UniProtKB/Swiss-Prot annotation:
PROSITE patterns hit by this protein: ARGE_DAPE_CPG2_2
Complex formation: Homodimer.
Family to which the UniProt record says this protein belongs: Belongs to the peptidase M20A family. DapE subfamily.
Name of the gene: dapE
Role description: Catalyzes the hydrolysis of N-succinyl-L,L-diaminopimelic acid (SDAP), forming succinate and LL-2,6-diaminopimelate (DAP), an intermediate involved in the bacterial biosynthesis of lysine and meso-diaminopimelic acid, an essential component of bacterial cell walls.
Alphabetized UniProt keyword annotations: Amino-acid biosynthesis, Cobalt, Diaminopimelate biosynthesis, Hydrolase, Lysine biosynthesis, Metal-binding, Zinc
Cofactor note: Binds 2 Zn(2+) or Co(2+) ions per subunit.
UniProt name for this protein: Succinyl-diaminopimelate desuccinylase
Cofactor: Zn(2+); Co(2+)
Gene3D superfamilies per record: 3.30.70.360, Zn peptidases
Record EC number: 3.5.1.18
Binding positions (Zn(2+) 2): 103, 138, 355
GO biological process: diaminopimelate biosynthetic process; L-arginine biosynthetic process; lysine biosynthetic process via diaminopimelate
Length: 381
């Protein structure tokens, strides 16, 4: 059934933060199989509203919760897709093409099939199964999983273990389990100099030499050497703007943006302090003023592999005959919110085609993911 579920889900044009009926489709399906469900819409303005679903079967412990998102990134030029239709699943050569196939409607389809089959085959099992789904993960992630977690806990619900269905695997299904994520902090630096004619530099103060020195040091500094589960923290310059299209004018100001992806040796605050010390030193040398702003969308986190995390890894190895690696690589995900409530793993399909034109998953990979999810439920519940 996971193939049919995936095809149906791809058919919803759920570009973030829109659900376009995907949440409602899952809600109806789960209701038909005895789940208690609730849809909540959070967000003040229409453009920011997110549709969220919590569904639960059973009331006993332990509760295994699948956390995911139905929203997808824009599909780009539709003409470049198979059948020129990214929101109509295309089944070719043992693959299913469509926006969201791996990120992450494929994982949702697999857990839907696994959980419904498990319930059918195991009446009276000892625990409970739940879904927490949102249409707001690929965008701002303000009114999705974060708000829904707080809401369901206020209602008395509890999760004992969560599976976040992000596309985590690198080369084959089962090679990677995420147990943490790097943090992310964005910086915007504005340096104010004094404009003037390029022929009279002594009557001006060009802010660019100062910025060049700052960025050179920032991009060459070694923030750390990494840890057991984390690669070293990394700074990338993302934009430089002087707003000057004239070749004979020294600019009055310049602006640069950069991002740091950091491990658990840092926080956004400690990095901001380190960055500002460098900026302050060069701005004093060049006698220019500066303004530094920063915002963090996620802190770094890491979980020590507990019994259920190890159980999950053992299931992967037993079912797929591959020993998974614990990893923290990649970007941010909603796992950063879930980790405050319960232990978790992130485990899904291959990440190779996520967000790309002609995103696809192999049907054989869907079967493998289904097998892992089903066998984990059998082991724990």
């Amino acid at each position: 059934m996971y193939i049919n579920y995936l095809k149906d889900l791809i058919g919803f044009k759920s570009v973030t933060p829109e659900s376009d009926g995907a949440i409602e489709y899952i809600d109806d399906l789960l209701k038909q199989h005895g789940f208690k469900t609730e849809i909540k819409i959070f967000g003040d303005s229409k453009s920011e509203q997110a549709t969220n679903l919590y569904a639960v079967f059973g009331s006993n412990e332990p509760n295994i919760c699948f956390v995911g998102h139905v929203d997808v990134v824009p599909a780009g030029n539709h003409e470049l897709w198979h059948n020129a239709s990214p929101f109509k699943a295309s089944h070719q050569d043992g693959k299913i093409y469509g926006r969201g196939a791996v990120d992450m409607k494929g994982a949702i389809a697999c857990f839907l099939a696994a959980s419904l089959d498990f319930i059918k085959n195991n009446t009276g099992f000892k625990g409970s199964i739940s879904f927490l789904l949102t249409s707001d993960e690929e965008g701002k992630a303000k009114h999705g999983t974060k708000e829904m977690l707080q809401y369901i806990y206020d209602q008395g619900h509890k999760m004992d273990f969560a599976i976040v269905g992000e596309p985590t695997c690198e080369k084959e299904i089962g090679d990677t389990i995420k147990i943490g994520r790097r943090g992310s902090v964005n910086f915007k630096l504005n340096i104010e100099g004094l404009s003037g004619h390029v022929a009279y530099p002594h009557k001006a103060n060009n802010p660019l030499p100062c910025l060049i020195k700052i960025l050179n040091e920032l991009t060459n500094i070694r923030l750390d050497k990494g840890t057991e589960f984390f690669q070293s923290s990394n700074l990338e310059v993302t934009n430089i703007d002087v707003g000057n299209n004239t070749s004979n004018v020294i600019p009055a100001s310049t602006e640069a943006s950069f991002n740091i992806r950091f491990n658990n040796l840092h926080s956004a605050e400690t990095l901001a302090k380190q960055v500002e010390e460098i900026i302050k030193r060069y701005c004093k040398e060049y006698k220019v003023d500066y303004k530094l702003e920063y915002s963090s969308s996620a802190d770094s986190f890491i979980q020590n592999p507990n019994d259920k995390i190890k159980d999950f890894a053992d299931i992967v190895e037993r079912v797929l005959k591959i020993k998974p690696e614990f990893s923290t690589s990649g970007g941010t995900s909603d796992a950063r919110f879930v980790k405050d409530y319960c232990p978790l793993v992130e485990f899904g399909l291959l990440s190779e085609t996520a967000h790309k034109i002609n995103e696809y998953t192999k049907i054989s990979d869907l079967q493998k993911l289904y097998d892992v999810y089903y066998n984990f439920l059998m082991e724990i519940l």
